[in-house]
Amino acid sequence: NYDNAYPILKKYGFKGTVFVVTSFLGTRKGYLTWDGCREMEKNGMTVASHTVDHKSMTDLTDDQLRAELVESKKKAEAELGHEVKYMAYPTGAYNLHIAQLVREAGYKAAFTIKYGGVSRKSNIYALERVPIFHTEKTNRDFVERIHYTPQFESFGWTKH
């Protein structure tokens, strides 16, 4: 994210969100660091939680879930100096009980890996996204999304 996507987003004035696994930051060469997170935030990016260890949440006990959610949020808030409002489910695995624990941990919303849009009726703890996957059509998909952004905005489908 920091080496590839961030410079392009910064160059063109786009904003984005990076979901961080707090125990991974700065642990290996090439991994994002907290300094990198702070720099990205200064340039309009949002840093959000992806738990402590990126474990599939449906495999964890309630105590383990709470630890993953709360400790990740606390660590990110301490490093960034502000509230961390959002999280993304590792591997996309969640259920309504897990979503409730996310809410109880203090997050304002959570993101799935399900492909789709968001409306006022969407469950804010199970928000769908429109990903850009690395495929032979990645560049074309990205260019089309940029090209059609004005139309999406006119329908109220985007917010920045």
Language-model region placement:
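Active-site beta->alpha N-cap acidic-glycine motif
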Residues: 1-43
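Short histidine/acidic/glycine/proline-rich micro-motifs that form metal-
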Residues: 23-27, 56, 90-93
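Append "and occasionally in soluble cytosolic enzymes with long acidic Gly/Pro-rich linkers
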Residues: 37-41, 48, 74
